Amino acid sequence: MLNKEFNKENPYIEFKEVYREEDYFDIIELGVYYYSNNGLNKRPYKITRVDILNKDKVTSPRLSVLEGYIKSWNESIKNEKYPNDWQLFYLYKEIFQKLIHNKDVKQCYNYFRGQSDSRYELIPSAFRSNVKKDFLRDFEGIYEELARLFPNRLTYHELSKQKIKDRETQLSLLQHFGLKTTLLDITSNPFVAMLFMLSENIDNYKEPTLYFFQLDKYADKSKIFVEVVKNEWNERIIAQRGAFLNFDWAILPSENIEQDMDAKIPTIKLVLKFDEKELQETLQASIQSLLDIGLSEDDAIEFVSPLENEYAKDNLKSMDLIKKELMEKLHEYFYSEVDLFPDFEKRIQYISSQYNLDLNKQLNIESK
């Protein structure tokens, strides 16, 4: 992890400026590719393959193990092993079995995070690009003032080695009630992570993403990892099987950290992607068939070009149907968005959102 001294006056501002995901996470990116599947009595999408997206950048010994898994997954896809109506869900289940419940592997992946778009970095909400510097500058004052106004709910603890464990408990409450903090939400349940991955409405093309983390809560190198301490105010976090990665640990002066902060968290980023390669092969095959019947190359290309736009529209429809299909299957396994909100205020908000006429205004339950 990054070993740097931060300005004591405004450490959050400086941390945001230098933060890089790769300084904290050793990420192997996997793509699950799908393709729009037109025709009567067909599922509207087809899973084509699983592949490694950043193979040329990976130095981790985990790579060879993953390559073996990918080979078996692709064989299952090729042989149409998965049930016709639920192809993607069962592929996810098989991926979970290999990465999470595999007795042949010493250390499996035990924490997860779902994000609706692969372009989003693994970064706590306080440090995201849509947050003003003023918030980071004023954060301590905001926290201190809230603790003064609501002493029965919140206690202020400064950012220091002596107070960090007490502070992170209070930060988890602030995040629970909607304030952006230095905590990154994760969960011990991959199906809950899937709910978050699918939480946003499909109004443009996005690549839903699941993260898998190897976190040993008893190892010094994972001290950035925080389990939630249950109390009367955090029912929602407990329902979500929640935990956090606390980046206050990365901001503390290095002499105060009795741990190996050079250790990065082994991570897999699983991205659902439209298969552009399959599209180009389909278009080329269409062009070739027109050439075979005597059309000129220019005429053949002109004739086929509109098909690319049609596939783009079909792709958006396919993604929307994939989301609905996965959510329906999660409901069959008794995982539902409403269960993520056991506390009174959030449950009321969620129920109200289901009756909004404007779907774009529905409650966004993405991880903070």
Residue ranges of model-derived segments:
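Catalytic-core elements of nucleic-acid end-processing and repair enzymes
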Residues: 1-368
